């Protein structure tokens, strides 16, 4: 019986964690508020990729890869995106 209770608790925790990783759609001011909050919490300042070129930053994929023609609005307003995607724009 204890094993069943432990198993159900474990499944519940896994379900909550996986639900928190699902993407959400952010548009307009909600997207701006979310970006400001995430970037502020992460301690990012908006700088260009060229600023980091001499500091060994090519190891960071979010700074070394080009996002192409798609922007944050295309990526997070038209389809759900996660916090990791949003953080890549900080």
From Swiss-Prot:
Family matches, as SMART domains: IlGF
Other remarks on this protein: Silk worm has two kinds of PTTH: 4K-PTTH and 22K-PTTH; there are many forms of 4K-PTTH.
Free-text function comment from the UniProt entry: Brain peptide responsible for activation of prothoracic glands to produce ecdysone in insects.
Official protein name in the record: Bombyxin D-1
Domain of life: Eukaryota
Organism for this UniProt entry: Bombyx mori (Silk moth)
Assembly: Heterodimer of a B chain and an A chain linked by two disulfide bonds.
Gene: BBXD1
CDD domains documented for this protein: IlGF_insulin_bombyxin_like
Keyword entries, A-Z: Cleavage on pair of basic residues, Disulfide bond, Hormone, Secreted, Signal
């Amino acid at each position: 019986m204890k094993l069943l209770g432990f198993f159900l608790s474990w499944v519940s925790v896994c379900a909550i964690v996986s639900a928190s990783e699902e993407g959400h759609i952010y548009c307009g001011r909600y997207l701006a508020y979310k970006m400001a909050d995430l970037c502020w919490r992460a301690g990012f300042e908006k700088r260009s990729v060229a600023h980091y070129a001499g500091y060994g930053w090519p190891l960071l994929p979010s700074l070394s890869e080009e996002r192409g023609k798609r922007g944050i609005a295309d990526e997070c307003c038209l389809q759900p995106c996660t916090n990791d995607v949003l953080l890549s724009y900080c």
